[in-house]
């Protein structure tokens, strides 16, 4: 499937997952989400939690466009590198929300209230020498 050249491009991240989202006006009546060349439902193995992470941004924009009587659908072409499926879905949500803000700047308060514009900076802590894991120490013996 060829990707159109016009549209909005934004990136997002979570843990070690990095995402690049290209948002393009849809040529047909329905919008589609393509992740690494596959439909989102196939890529995320029909997992409702991961799909809901992504679709919440789409739902907010859909409701807002109905209120403003705008009938524009968008296709999302997404490239994901690294991380697990959960981190990838959260990174996609962040990048999608950033993309939709380019088109609908008045949605910032909606996305901000729900925490969709904040990158979760928590990552795995590194292992320290002398310890078994990041914080787990070997058993201590007094005698």
Q: Residues of each region from the PLM?
A:
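Mid-chain, well-packed structural core segment of small domains
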Residues: 65-97, 101
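Basic, glycine/proline-rich low-complexity segments that contact nucleic acids
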Residues: 86-89, 93, 97-143
